[in-house]
């Protein structure tokens, strides 16, 4: 059943409109410098993140695994991550715990030298859901499976509310994270609805190392699950998905809130290198791309490479036009915030 759901998620994300109605990165404007006083060829896009060096401040965000079609996608993404020295996450690894025969759909990334590898498990699986929660041995298995540097714990409770088979219990998640943080380097990750500053602080107090905001702007899993419910003829879940299609904290606002608390991966609706530059300017350490790369990854390494090369070029152009020689200078660049994002930034 999990494998079928993974396949459905991939095909829906590729073929349906599952984006939020507004991309809030369009409300961020970087200040242009007519005389940048920078040599484009000397611009340094390298960055250090939690003790690891990357050639470019980009994460291939967690997307897939647990289905045969995911194996090729993860292999292609890992090949590109090695080539351009990018961080990479895999999709939820619950499938590998339930069915070990699916493990190679994740471990395939070990065939490439990815500088930062991020394992992945859902926050709902950390607490009982009518059955026992996964234990530390299960998490150690998936962590070791891809020789991970970090464990992403993804918070997808909106998705769970729309899923026909969704989990309903969130009580005790922070407690479990605190227990696990002594054994694993944890990154808290949303899946399209963002984190508030208060939640970020609770996670920091529980020992989380960083946050991937994955806020409202790009793919919304309420929409993904709306289409699954539609295909299954589940009118109740369709209505919930439609009602909460645009639920969440805008990605740029979530970056702004959380960057005072923990290192942040800005994600949720990033489409190009300019969006990435905007995320860095708001306080993100890295930017995460997912659906932007998915169709290419389903085709070939070359297709993903072309996309990543364009993202990097656009990012450098944005750095040049704002007069910044390195990523650390970009974080201080002047910006203008437009409506409706401005209201969120003032909360």
UniProtKB/Swiss-Prot annotation:
One of its GO terms (biological process) is isoprenoid biosynthetic process. CDD domains: IDI-2_FMN. Its cofactor is FMN; NADPH; Mg(2+). It is found in: Cytoplasm. Its EC number is 5.3.3.2. Substrate binds at residues 5-6, 92-94, 159. Its main location: cytoplasm. InterPro entries: Aldolase_TIM, FMN-dep_DH, IPdP_isomerase. It comes from the Archaea. The keyword Electron transport does not apply. GO terms for cellular component: cytoplasm. Mg(2+) binds at residue 160. It is an enzyme of class 5 (isomerase). One of its GO terms (molecular function) is isopentenyl-diphosphate delta-isomerase activity. Keywords: Cytoplasm, Flavoprotein, FMN, Isomerase, Isoprene biosynthesis, Magnesium, Metal-binding, NADP. It catalyses: isopentenyl diphosphate = dimethylallyl diphosphate. FMN binds at residues 61-64, 92, 120, 189, 214, 219, 269-271, 290-291. Pfam families: FMN_dh (PF01070). Homooctamer. Dimer of tetramers. Involved in the biosynthesis of isoprenoids. Catalyzes the 1,3-allylic rearrangement of the homoallylic substrate isopentenyl (IPP) to its allylic isomer, dimethylallyl diphosphate (DMAPP). Belongs to the IPP isomerase type 2 family. PANTHER family: ISOPENTENYL-DIPHOSPHATE DELTA-ISOMERASE. This is Isopentenyl-diphosphate delta-isomerase. The gene is fni.
């Amino acid at each position: 059943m999990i494998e079928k759901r993974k396949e459905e998620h991939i095909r829906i994300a590729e073929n349906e409109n599952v984006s939020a109605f507004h991309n809030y990165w369009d409300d961020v404007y970087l200040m242009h410098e007519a005389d940048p006083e920078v040599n484009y060829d000397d611009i340094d896009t390298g960055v250090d993140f939690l003790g690891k060096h990357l050639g470019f401040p980009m994460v291939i965000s967690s997307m897939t695994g647990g289905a045969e079609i995911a194996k090729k996608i993860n292999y292609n993404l890992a090949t590109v991550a090695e080539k351009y020295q990018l961080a990479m996450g895999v999709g939820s690894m619950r499938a590998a715990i339930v069915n070990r025969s699916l493990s190679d759909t994740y471990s395939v990334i070990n065939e490439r030298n990815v500088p930062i590898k991020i394992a992945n498990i859902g926050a709902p699986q950390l607490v009982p859901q009518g059955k026992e929660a996964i234990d530390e041995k299960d998490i150690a298995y998936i962590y070791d499976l891809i020789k991970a540097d970090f464990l992403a714990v993804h918070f997808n409770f909106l998705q769970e509310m729309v899923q026909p088979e969704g989990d309903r219990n969130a009580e005790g998640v922070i407690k479990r994270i605190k227990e696990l943080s002594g054994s694993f380097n944890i990154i808290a990750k949303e899946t399209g609805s963002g984190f508030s500053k208060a939640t970020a602080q609770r996670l920091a107090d529980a020992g989380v190392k960083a946050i991937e905001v994955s806020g409202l702007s790009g793919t919304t899993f309420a929409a993904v699950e709306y289409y699954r419910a539609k295909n299954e003829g589940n009118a109740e879940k369709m209505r919930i998905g439609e009602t909460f299609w645009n639920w969440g904290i805008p990605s740029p606002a979530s970056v702004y809130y959380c960057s005072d608390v923990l290192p942040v991966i800005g994600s949720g609706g990033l489409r190009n290198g300019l969006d990435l530059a905007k995320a860095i300017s708001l306080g993100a350490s890295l930017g995460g791309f997912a659906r932007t790369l998915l169709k290419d990854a389903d085709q070939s390494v070359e297709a993903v490479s072309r996309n990543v090369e364009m993202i990097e070029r656009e990012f450098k152009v944005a750095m040049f036009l704002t007069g910044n020689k390195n990523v650390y200078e970009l974080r201080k660049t002047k910006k203008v915030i437009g409506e409706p994002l401005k209201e969120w930034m003032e909360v």
